[in-house]
Every structure is written in C-alpha cells, then in structure tokens.
Amino acid sequence: IAGVDVVCDHIDQDLSQQSMVVLRLACRPDLSLHSALDTEDGRSVADMIIDSLFDEGQDGRIPVVSYSGGAESLGLGQAIHAMLTMAGFKTALSSKKGLNLIDHYVDHARDISQTTNWFAGRRCLISKQVEAAVMRVDALSILSEGLPFDRSSVAVLTSLGPRDGLEEWDIVDASKHFNVMRTAVDVVLSNGAAALNADEVGLLPIAELCDGEIIWFAGSPENAILQEHFRQGGRGVYLLDGMIHYQEGTQPGIRLISMSSFKGLLSAEGAMAAIAAAWALNVTPELIHASLAFYLEKGWAKNPSNQRVET
C-alpha cells in the first residue's frame, strides 16, 4: 500500500514512545527497492514478500493464449474462448470482433486495430475476475507496441499472416516477417505449448524457438512433420476423410468431430488450431467435442452468449 522511511532509536518499539522522524512516504513502493535487502538469516526481503503473496507452487499467472494467422484464422479466437469458457474458465477475448470480457462484449470492433492492440490485451489481463485470456496478435501490433504479456501458456499460429502494410517497418520479405512473428512463440512458458500448422513451410523453423511443447496440426495424417512428431511421442491434430482426429504418439488417432459440423464458421486450419490450443491447456477431448457441439448449435461464432457449462 505504501512505503514509509523512518529514522528512530528502536524500530522494534512503539514509535509514539520514542524520538523519530518520517523522512518519506512513498504511495507506490517499488519491489525492486527491497531486492538488495536481506534479513538476519540471509533471506531476501523481496522474496519473502512474493512468497507471502502466492502459495507454494503458484506464480499468480493465468492461462494466456495468443493466436495469429491470415484469413484461415477468422473465428479461431471465438472458438478457443468458447471452449475455455465452457471448461469453467472466466475468459476474456481480444479479437477482430471486439473485446469480450467474460461473455460480454464491452467494445465492439469499429476499428480492428483498436481491439487487437496492446491496450486491448492489457484490458483482458487487468480484470481480477478473468481466469484465462485469449488474444489475437499480429505483426503490426508487435512492431508498433509489442506484446501485452510477458509470457504465454499457448501460442497458436495457423500461418505467418499477411505482410500488407509492414513496409514502413522494413518488413519486406518472408525472413523479416518470420523474425517478427517468432516473438509469439519465443515467450511461451516451459510448461506451455505452441500449436503450429505443419502444412505451412514458413512455420516449420519456428518450432525450435519454443521453450514448451509443440502440438502440430495438418490437413492429412501423412504430413511428414506430423508423422515424425508422432514417432517421437508428440501430440497432433489432423484431418482425415472429413473428420478431425487427435493423436498422441504412435497410438491410433481418435475421431473428434466432422468438419461439416462447422458449416463454414471455421476453416479446417482454424478448427484444428482451436482444438490443439484447448488440448494444450488440458481440456479433455470429450469436453472439447461437447464444447464445439454447443458452440456450433448456439451460434457462438456469430453471437457469443452468456450461456456457460460448469465442469
């Protein structure tokens, strides 16, 4: 609440009973002021303050999902938002459709840049009620403002996205575009994951930059990247005979949902990416299927409602 600098004879005694003077009252103390201070037993004062704020094993973070891509990613944020909401998270969403805080659009998008920027992302995180956040990030917002978070739980990339309008930042070729979009994967936590499109050649090198797990998705189980990933025990999502399957390691793939169910609300890449993102956050395949069915039946992609399923 405040930091008080005091000079007195005995700090462990009542100040009103001794000579003392208040040198400074800091209404917004900086934790870094305590970082160089140690107690008699050698413990850092700053560490003690942090330990008192969070229980053992907790770091105060909520799941943060970033997603990027081109036209194939339209509706992706709404699908992830719906699945996390129905999994029990109070979820915020910053997308091209606007800013949605726990199932209520508080800012409909009149200008896309105003709801997919740093400020919109910070609004997702600042609410104490929000338990998970889904944010669209693109090259322009990264270049002009940076990411609204320091680390994320999941980064989803269906493609590098369009390069239009980036010339003023000297982003004139695929290599420079890659260097910008890698940022979203660079900040994934070690216990997080990146969901990447294995059919996009431009995304393949980005997997090496992720500190966490990689979940590939592809339009066919015969994709070479996906096949090698399964041989190494990894998780993946793919399309086969019009059905989206999920698979882990060399175990047989399991059918999850038909692409025809999406009725054009999501592209194949978007649907697989959304499933991979939810799976990365340990949403069970059964709940993913139920969430998507409810999402499609109630028209969440067009008009997310206040309906919620507790689990």
Positions of PLM-derived features:
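Short, well-ordered alpha-helices that flank and scaffold nucleotide-derived cofactor binding pockets
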Residues: 51, 78, 82-86, 208, ...
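ATP-dependent carboxylate activation and anion-phosphoryl transfer catalytic cores
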Residues: 1-66
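Walker A (P-loop) phosphate-binding motif
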Residues: 56-105
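Acidic, Mg2+-coordinating active-site environments of NTP-dependent enzymes
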Residues: 128, 144-310
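A glycine-rich phosphate-binding loop feature that marks nucleotide/adenosyl-phosphate handling sites
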Residues: 6-14, 70, 199-202, 292-296
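Short amphipathic alpha-helices and their capping/turn segments at secondary-structure boundaries
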Residues: 81-84, 140-149
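Protein kinase-like catalytic core scaffold
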Residues: 21-23, 133, 194
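Conserved nucleotide-sensing/catalytic segment adjacent to the nucleotide-binding pocket
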Residues: 100, 104-145, 157
